[in-house]
Amino acid sequence: MPRLQQKWLNSRECPTLRREAAKGLFPTKDDPSACTRMSPSDKDILILCCKLGIALLCLGLLGEVAVRARRALTLDSFNNSSVQDYNLNNSENSTFLLGQGPQPTSSYKPHRLCPSEIEIRMLAKNYIFTNKTNPIGRLLIMMLRNESLSFSTIFTQIQRLEMGIENRKRRSTSVEEQVQGLRASGLEVKRGKRSTLVKIGDRWWQPGTYRGPYIYRPTDAPLPYTGRYDLNFDRWVTVNGYKVLYRSLPFRERLARARPPWCVLTQEEKDDIKQQVHDYIYLGTGMNVWGKIFHYTKEGAVARQLEHISADTFGMSYNG
């Protein structure tokens, strides 16, 4: 036997089992099936699987008991404490949600404050079929799928969503108020599809989209690739008749309007870029002076007035 193997067999760290201790590990003449007895049989595997299944079943039953206990506690706490919190006696929403008819004004309180699952399903159907994108209907469906949520939580969420929908309706009707307010200040105003439009110069602008006057006439539309540069040296393009800064476009639009290599441009586009560079170099001071003079023109006065009004209305100032 080699010296290294001899040392390993004699070491105290991993002693080799000998004589009586080694019985059953290796096949011998007296016990030829010793090694096969050590591997588990099919019967052992089946017993182990049965034990695992019983353990999982017990865990599931324990979880079900815990969920039911939690649900019962939630319902008890809702019946005891939530009547005063949500003012269920006087609220029309609570009458609609709970489906119990008008509540009496006396101190009588009904026993069943939490609606049944059928009532919740009917309420969800009512919301979903009237408007499929309604957030309250989606919330009710989520409550039906995830039954661990307590009804008091759902009720507060529905109240919040109702308030949000009301605020959204109010905001959508405030365009008329904007028009009246801007007309009262002496501006030429008209109502657009989504917001007010104010006339500055010979064009209509949304409040907040105005970024200073054009270098060229507005009828002179910018070329598709190059765009134009305004008095603030910001590149802008025309989108749906509005002046939009190039940096405020979404990434795909910027990518679509990116300038191709010089060799691909037509002669007209090359001349246009050269002219803009020429204006940058030779008209820089003149453009700055024109920017200062602009505030004293009629268009500048309208723009400043609109800026103050939009700052008061929207809580922010749009610096051109």
Swiss-Prot record:
Organism taxonomic ancestry: Viruses, Riboviria, Pararnavirae, Artverviricota, Revtraviricetes
Residues listed as glycosylation sites in the UniProt record: N79, N80, N89, N93, N131, N146
Superkingdom of the source species: Viruses
Membership in a protein family: Belongs to the mouse mammary tumor virus PR73 superantigen family.
Bilayer topology term: Single-pass type II membrane protein
Stated name of the protein: Protein PR73 3'-endogenous
Native species: Mouse mammary tumor virus (strain GR) (MMTV)
TM region(s), chain numbering: 45-65
Membrane topology, Extracellular segments: 66-320
Purpose of the protein: Superantigen.
Chief location bin: membrane
Further remark: This protein is coded in the long terminal repeat (LTR).
A GO CC term assigned to this protein in UniProt: membrane
Pfam families linked to this entry: MMTV_SAg (PF01054)
Location in the cell: Membrane
The entry's keywords: Glycoprotein, Membrane, Signal-anchor, Superantigen, Transmembrane, Transmembrane helix
Presence of the UniProt keyword Isomerase in the record: no
Cytoplasmic topology ranges: 1-44
